[in-house]
Amino acid sequence: MPYRLEKDFQDLIASNNNIQKDICSVLEMDYKDFKLLREDTYINGIIADFTLFERNKVRAIIECKGGAIGVSEYVRGIGQIFQYEYFFENHLSLKNYEFCQNFNSVLVFPESVLKNNDFNVGLFKYPKSKKILEINSHNLAVRHINDNELEKLRETKHRDFKVISPCTRNELVFYKK
């Protein structure tokens, strides 16, 4: 399984311009206005995997998860992006960052998280500012799991269905176990 470790997945995002461009596209921002800062420290010693700047203001704080996680680590990631939203709402920054009004807290992970687990990502509470991104580790396509997809997943509460991560963007496929 590629990108099992969070550090390897972070390295991929930090080094791949196409992934960075796709993230900018999901966030509806121009790549030329983009700057990515890795392992940025916020209050209480919280270290964000990435801070994404647009015109020198914080546009997003990104939490990465490696491919070898289970439900507990996924929920921990949700907690982290809730905290990032709190930083935005209260203008909390050790470095006196300004925040964009269209700020997003981002949770990003490889497709293996959905393929290899039985939990339903539609049955969690997420912050209002959230963007959930899945990166296909084979073709490096970035997919935004939007509110419509989360709603479809919420409707399949029973365990007879599982999400299969797509090989292309903007597809959500279910299969019966």
Residue ranges and their predicted role:
Residues 1-177:
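Charged, terminal alpha-helix-loop-beta segments
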